Every structure is written in structure tokens, then in C-alpha cells.
Amino acid sequence: MAQDPNHLIWLDMEMTGLEPDRDRIIEIALVITDSQLNTIAEAPVIAVHQPESVLDAMDDWNKNTHGKSGLIDRVRASTVSEAEAEARMLAFLQEWVPARTSPMCGNSICQDRRFLARYMPAFEAWFHYRNLDVSTLKELAKRWRPEVYKGVDKKGKHEALADIHESIGELRHYRDNFLRLA
């Protein structure tokens, strides 16, 4: 359990929508990997309580997706506030990664960063300002090497921890089949 500045922090969140001005965070997961993408630690996944009015305001896609996964029920049952979720995630990160050393890692993580900046600014500030966004490689492979892009098997569960593991696997795929490391 030693801090290592070379560890990578992988983040995924589920939200009630895509607009931080009106939508809220409902689930957070973190995974720490080494620089070779081997899992070092996983934080407990947190369902963040939100009032019924926030859940009712979700569009049909979010209600359907988060309803099927059971997330809406877990959010209703949760007693963890956004502030408490932020404190728990920061406590976890303090064990593994020094502040402002790891980029935020994941898929389309600019979206996650927008929500963190709005609702959990201390948590967002723990990350380096850089991003390691797997979706950049996805977009490049789609255009430059479609056969590599098509080789990615994603389930798209929209469950935070499962999505992180898919993102790590996707980056491994691009590392092995798209990037020339030798």
C-alpha cells in the first residue's frame, strides 16, 4: 500500500445525464493500475444517493439503462452523499497515488472531469491536469486502422467498475495491435 507516482488512476462514473448543470453523479468506481496496466487496487464502488426529484428528471435512456442494471435501486437505497463519496475516494487515492501525478484515465473522461469539477472539486484536483483518454485511440483506430477498431469487444454495461475494466482491456488491445512500442 505504498504511494507510487507511476500508478495510474482509472475512473468511471454513471450520471443521470450528460449536463453537469442539471444532472448528477450516481455511481463512482476507481481502479489503480501500474504503468503496464496491471491492476493494483480497486476502490469499493459507491452508489451516490440522489433525491427522487433528480432520478425522476432522467431521460428515458438513463431510466432504462440504470433501471435494468439495478443502479437506480442502489442509488435510492444508498445513504452516501456526494460529499461523503468524495471523501471516501480521496482517502483511497491517498493510499496509492501522490496528488497531481496520475492523469485521469478512462473512456471519454472529459465528461467525468466536468462532473467532478462541479460536484467533487477536491477529488478532481487530486488528478494531474492531463488525461489518458482511451477514446482518443478508439477514434484514431476507427479512422486509420478499422480492423483494429473492430477487434475491441465491449459489452457497454454502463456499470462503473465493469466499464473501467473494459477501458483497461481496450487500451491493452490498442497497445498490442495499434501502437508500435518496439
Curated annotation (Swiss-Prot):
Q: Name one GO cellular component term.
A: cytoplasm
What EC number(s) would the UniProt record show? 3.1.15.-
Under the heading CDD domains, the entry gives:
Orn
Cite the GO molecular-function annotations of the record. Answer: 3'-5'-RNA exonuclease activity; nucleic acid binding
Query: This protein's superkingdom?
Result: Bacteria
| SMART domains associated with the record | EXOIII
GO terms in the biological process aspect are: DNA metabolic process
Q: What does the UniProt entry say about where the protein is found? A: Cytoplasm
> Could you tell me the keywords of this UniProt record?
Cytoplasm, Exonuclease, Hydrolase, Nuclease
User: What InterPro entries has UniProt attached to this entry?
Assistant: Exonuclease_RNaseT/DNA_pol3, Oligoribonuclease, RNaseH-like_sf, RNaseH_sf
Signal peptide start and end residues: none
Coarse class of the primary localization is cytoplasm
Purpose of the protein = 3'-to-5' exoribonuclease specific for small oligoribonucleotides.
Q: What is this protein called?
A: Oligoribonuclease
